[in-house]
Amino acid sequence: MGKSILHVGELGNAKLVKNAMAMFAAVQHMSLVEICCWLRKGGLDEATFRTIVTNSQQDSVATRRIMETVVSRNYKPRKSWMPKDVSFGLDMAREMEVPMPFVGLAYQMFAIAQATSQDGYEATGIACNLYDLINGEKSGKG
């Protein structure tokens, strides 16, 4: 949620922006968790990577929040609305004939999570549990 209300122009633009933010967040969640899994296999723990990200140009409120959840493995058990918003955004992109391959892959990851009952959490928990499943590791808390 943003800190202020912004006028985004014509009627319908707010829905476009809402879905765009969900699409951006979905790719960000999945990519950060994927990178953490790869680094862990290489011997670098998530806490160290969190420190690196926090002290880099990639630092943001979003990356700090995602990395804190990845490190703590304390996932909020709740329904995530992100997959629904991403799906709506992809539908709009198809209608506009705009290819969205990264967002499409993130959406497919959410679909895999749903099919394997890994979707009962907020987005970071979904991503972490899904990547644990893919990598044959024990799922985190949840």
Per-region residue spans from a language model:
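Hydrophobic alpha-helical segments
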Residues: Y131-G142
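Ligand/cofactor pocket segment of small-molecule handling proteins
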Residues: M1-K18
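Helical "substrate-binding/catalytic lid" subdomain
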Residues: A14-L133
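A charged, well-structured terminal subsegment
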Residues: S4-V8, W81, V86, G140-G142
